[in-house]
Swiss-Prot record:
Family statement drawn from the similarity comment of this UniProt entry: Belongs to the universal ribosomal protein uL6 family.
Function: This protein binds to the 23S rRNA, and is important in its secondary structure. It is located near the subunit interface in the base of the L7/L12 stalk, and near the tRNA binding site of the peptidyltransferase center.
Assigned GO CC terms: cytosolic large ribosomal subunit
Gene that this polypeptide is encoded by: rplF
PROSITE patterns: RIBOSOMAL_L6_1 (PS00525)
Gene Ontology biological process: cytoplasmic translation
Protein name: Large ribosomal subunit protein uL6
Length: 177
């Protein structure tokens, strides 16, 4: 049985949570997010907290309640503080440049790659080899970061590629004669 759902989500000052049938909307200083709640979960909003209760008779209701609680907590944190993901480009000639709402990547291919940023994600390039993605939706930030990393994942022999800032690349030794 999941114990995650037993802890309520506290609503900080400046954040408004509303429930309309099975649609939960969270509004805050950085934006607003909407999510459809699973039918196996009852959501109760009271006195600055959101509680999640499983529906009786549904076999995986506790699991769904725990998942819903984690997703709603990420929504509350996103609209109040926001999320950020840092990427680092490692390799000779690897560069990133922000052009409008697109990221222009030079990753050793014969052509530059242009990655279009979806709505709700902003990017910043403090240096030519660093990318900082910011937004309110944790899942969307992670998805965009994974797509950019997917163009040139770090390889184990020289460590070249696009990596997360906190990622440790396991290095291999080259073949010996």
């Amino acid at each position: 049985m999941s114990r995650v759902a037993k802890a309520p989500v506290s609503i900080p000052a400046g954040v408004e949570v509303t429930l309309n049938e099975q649609t939960l909307t969270v509004k805050g200083g950085k934006g607003s997010l909407t999510r459809v709640i699973n039918n196996a979960v009852n959501v109760v909003i009271e006195a600055g907290v959101v509680k999640f209760l499983p529906v009786e008779g549904v076999s995986n209701a506790w699991a769904q309640a725990g998942t819903t609680r984690a997703l709603v907590n990420n929504m509350v944190v996103g609209v109040s503080q926001g999320f950020e993901r840092k990427l680092k480009l490692v390799g000779v000639g690897y560069r990133a440049k922000l052009v409008g709402s697109d990221i222009d990547l030079t990753l050793g291919f014969s052509h530059p790659l242009v990655h279009k940023l979806p709505a709700g994600v902003t990017a910043e390039c403090p240096s030519q080899t660093d990318i900082v993605l910011r937004g309110v939706d944790k899942q969307l930030i992670g998805q965009v970061a994974a797509e950019i990393r997917g163009y040139r994942p770090p390889e184990p022999y020289k460590g070249k590629g696009v990596r997360y800032d906190d990622e440790v690349v396991r290095r291999k030794e080259a073949k010996k004669k």
